[in-house]
Amino acid sequence: MSEQIFELKDVYYAYLGKFPALSGVNLGVQAGEKISIMGANGTGKSTILAILDGLIFPDKGTINAFGKELNEDILSNEEFSQFFRSKVGFVFQNPDVQLFCPTVKEDIVFGPLQLGVSQGETMERLGKYAQLLEIEDLLDRAPHQLSIGEKKKLRWQPYWQ
């Protein structure tokens, strides 16, 4: 039997405590399994993904990730947090939400540095990634100075590590 990566049990979530997004959701994801979350606008797809990534937490119900209950306390644990962040990522629908540092370069290196990758290795990876995606000319620019196309090109940057 394969390892259970994620399990949502009877999950409820409401934005600002009053706008329901999820109501009694149950979901299991096994190691190696590929899933698709589909539905109309406003049906909670992005909310489920944000919960799976530990960006928000259910109002009611539980989420387990890699055999542990996922909550703010466990994500405060440096060892688990590094393990979790090395396995789970999130690509925002709107690249303006994703790019939050003063320069593109700082935005790209933020994740690996938070995961404990050394400054030297991070900069080496940055050079390879920038050359591969032909974004060397964007590195010193502020995210708000980028075109929509340039921002979309950078939306995959959390996964270059």
What label would you give each PLM region?
Residues M38-A40:
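The feature captures the beta-strand-to-loop junction immediately N-terminal to the Walker
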Residues G120-L138:
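Conserved ABC ATPase "signature" region
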